[in-house]
Amino acid sequence: MISFSSFYRQIADTQLQHWLESLPAILGEWQRQHKHGNLPKWEKVLAKLHYPAPEFLDLKDSVTIGDGLQLDSGQTEKLENLLKILQPWRKGPFHVHGIHIDTEWRSDWKWDRVSPHLSPLTNRTVLDVGCGSGYHMWRMLGAGAKRVVGIDPSALFLCQFEAIKRLIDTELPVHLLPLGIEELPPLDAFDTVFSMGVLYHRRSPIDHLLQLRDQLRMGGELVLETLVVDGDKDTVLVPQDRYGKMNNVWFLPSIDALKLWLEKCDFTDVRCVNVDVTSLAEQRSTPWMQNESLVDYLDPKDVNLTVEGYPAPKRATFIAVKNRSPQDAD
């Protein structure tokens, strides 16, 4: 069973220590109630990941573990077969002892778009909401973050993250909790909070922005990336049924509308720093993710539209600063 004891130990004397009053019970309940049928199989994979500490590690420019020379061919083949049990791999890529985990998303491209606009992460305590398997968390650590906490309710993402962590160093200050943000007690403690690819999945986007705000310290930085549409401050697309075959897409605002939402939630210095149409090269099926992908979600006759006739995915990244505490604002 995956243990969170290292996380509890590491936050005991930090600004996150108040979580110790409630998170052990919340995560204990998750462990008791989570009944995903594949979890025992995935945990068996984790139990077999006994490999020497990597002699080479790059988290600054990629997520590369080992130089490809440390393991013999038999060890490498065994490791690759174990990691393939954890498919589908959606966020990455990862380079593990010469094995290229070619994930569905080129998450490194997103990081390259976002990272130049961030306040330096050096010595910052960071929260990554909807972190997936944790690719960006490793890049945050590589950028100098003091501590990185990611949250995502998926058991598979948790196991993928744990696999990578066990191949690097289990005591590094980077942790994934299998929770949604609505389960986190407000903390007002993080220096930087990321929410990338989450807002459009929320039934109440304003509540999500307030939940993000409640995790930030005063003056802390929010990094928000989400799907947007063209239009003015009054433009919001609400898909009638599905969007790109997804039935959990609720609100796609215009850039100006989202800026207004952020300001309404007491964020200041709101800036849209990047707008990018998702390309077929950035999101696609691979041997490590063999399900449908972006090409299957777009109109085969016009890639500027989804199969439902909505505008194709366009993503905007915003940076904003928490201006007031919840007590002052609400």
From Swiss-Prot:
Entry keywords, A to Z: Transferase, tRNA processing
Catalysed reactions listed for this entry: carboxy-S-adenosyl-L-methionine + 5-hydroxyuridine(34) in tRNA = 5-carboxymethoxyuridine(34) in tRNA + S-adenosyl-L-homocysteine + H(+)
Entry's EC annotation: 2.5.1.-
Entry's Gene Ontology BP terms: tRNA wobble uridine modification
Molecular function GO labels: methyltransferase activity; transferase activity, transferring alkyl or aryl (other than methyl) groups
InterPro entries per UniProt: CmoB (IPR010017), Mo5U34_MeTrfas-like (IPR027555), SAM-dependent_MTases_sf (IPR029063)
Pfam families, per database record: Methyltransf_9
Positions with a binding annotation for carboxy-S-adenosyl-L-methionine: 91, 105, 110, 130, 152-154, 181-182, 196, 200, 315
Domain of life: Bacteria
HAMAP family documented for this protein: tRNA_carboxymethyltr_CmoB (MF_01590)
UniProt function note: Catalyzes carboxymethyl transfer from carboxy-S-adenosyl-L-methionine (Cx-SAM) to 5-hydroxyuridine (ho5U) to form 5-carboxymethoxyuridine (cmo5U) at position 34 in tRNAs.
Protein family: Belongs to the class I-like SAM-binding methyltransferase superfamily. CmoB family.
Subunit structure comment from the entry: Homotetramer.
Protein name (database record): tRNA U34 carboxymethyltransferase
